[in-house]
Amino acid sequence: KRRGIRIVFDTNYRARNWPDPSIARTAYGGLAGVIDVMLAGEEDIALLFGRSDTDVALREWLDFERCEVVLKCGSGDSRIWAEGREWRASAEHVDKVVDTTAAGDSFAAAFLAARLSGAAPDEAARAGHRLAAEVIRHPGAIIPITAMPNLALVTESTSAIVP
């Protein structure tokens, strides 16, 4: 961090890798003061806390002033706590889902690329949703280069700042 490097952590929680969810919560929570961005899947947080109100669980668990938090919610709106406020971005509707492999990683890649390019949190999340939507239209984790969306064109806002 002293050299200007941003540190990102994706929870990618797998219960079988931890003896108890409380140990994972403590380990992950301890990273909040070290990392710049935490990416968490809604399912991961629900499993970690044993509850469905994931945004409340995150608020109780993390100090949002210390790191940017991105809650990925599958086909639902993503929620981002950054720059002192909460942001939301709508997921793109996909008529025919072929394979969800790499959807979360695709969201993360586009989100981070957009943020590093100076995009606001909501614009970055929209870029993440756009790439994830394209990826799930294809089998497997690697899509044809011709199917890659131009994420620079993701400019029209469909998200909202939550007061």
Predicted regions and their residues:
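Conserved phosphate-binding/catalytic region of the ribokinase-like
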Residues: 50-163
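Conserved beta-alpha-beta core of the PfkB/ribokinase-like small-molecule kinase fold
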Residues: 1-59, 75-78
